[in-house]
Amino acid sequence: MSEVAELAAFREEVRAWLEANCPAEMREPVRDESDMCWGGRNARFKNEAQKLWMERMAERGWTVPDWPTDYGGGGLSPAETKILKQEMARIGARNPLMSFGISMLGPALLKYGSEAQKKRFLPEIARGEIRWCQGYSEPGAGSDLASLQTRCEDKGDHWLVNGQKVWTSYADKADWIFCLVRTDPKAPKHKGISFLLFDMASPGVSTKPILLISGSSPFCETFFDDVKVPKDQVVGEVDKGWDVAKYLLGHEREMISGMGLGGQTGSLGEAFADLLADDPILRADMARFDVDAMAYRAMSERFIDELKAGMAHPAQPSMMKYAGTELNKARHELVMAAGGSNALEWESDRSKKGKA
């Protein structure tokens, strides 16, 4: 059988499996954070369908379809992974598991982690059994991240961590943290940094949610006071954590570029076809947007392939983030132009029930 025929057969298999196994509730647009499944040891599911969808996908290894099967993945090729995503988009299937472990830490562990670290953490990430947060930014180290000052001292049989992180997304809900710490304070600022993993339930770890003007608190201040961490929880080499951090940031931007269209996969022109017949200007604007969206998706796929092959230009992640943000802004403006003030209401007919 040719490769084309094999992929066609795989598509049919995926389509049939998704139709049989994706609950109807998981084929609706994500309206708020409660519609997202984050997993973790204290996971809260909005309904049984959300839990069932995550478990079924994890059993197939399709929460992380391109990871090796030895680590809980599906072992799919890039072409097969693309087909899976296309077929999920075709029926409007939700992402079964939102996870910084999947989008950021996992790729870094696959590249830099020890075999013991991979076997310990990756299957738990794939099954949604562990929720991670990212300990990068500090009060004095934001855009200049390498200026971080969180201290990590070698105490012989363990590391001792003291310091503070800020803007730590969902730190108050996370089970573990991947954290940048300074292990050599005398080294140049990009040196002497190590990439450390530790349990957020460790003695000495505390969090303080940051209240935003919206009333929500997705970010936290995170404090470390004499936190003891086992020696084998450094990823990569001691004092060379900056390499791991940069690699991880590339995958974080991959995740962000994938969100550039706000999770929407359909055509605006098709969604608003009933409103466009008498408005040639709006019809042309939406057609132009749909073409731009197709180009962005193609560019995003190319970027992801180059990133995984180690061929991405250093400026590409930032370029994708900027392009995606501008495109998503244009989408919202067009939805408002088509639906008027009624489009502000997520469930309204003019907002296409959140599908536009």
Give the location of each predicted region.
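N-terminal glycine-rich flavin-associated loop
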Residues: 97-116, 142
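A short core secondary-structure module
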Residues: 149, 157-158, 162-208
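Glycine-rich beta->alpha junctions and the first turn(s) of the following alpha-helix
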Residues: 5, 204-298
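C-terminal helix-coil-helix/basic helical segment that borders enzyme active sites and/or dimer interfaces
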Residues: 28-32, 280-283, 294-355
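A short, Trp-centered hydrophobic/proline-enriched beta-strand micro-motif
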Residues: 128-136, 180
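Amphipathic, small/basic residue-rich leader segments at the start of a protein or domain
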Residues: 1-99, 120-127, 257, 279-287, ...
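Buried hydrophobic positions in well-ordered alpha/beta secondary-structure cores of metabolic enzymes
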Residues: 7, 18, 61, 68, ...
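Cytochrome P450 C-terminal beta-domain/meander region
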Residues: 144-162, 348-355
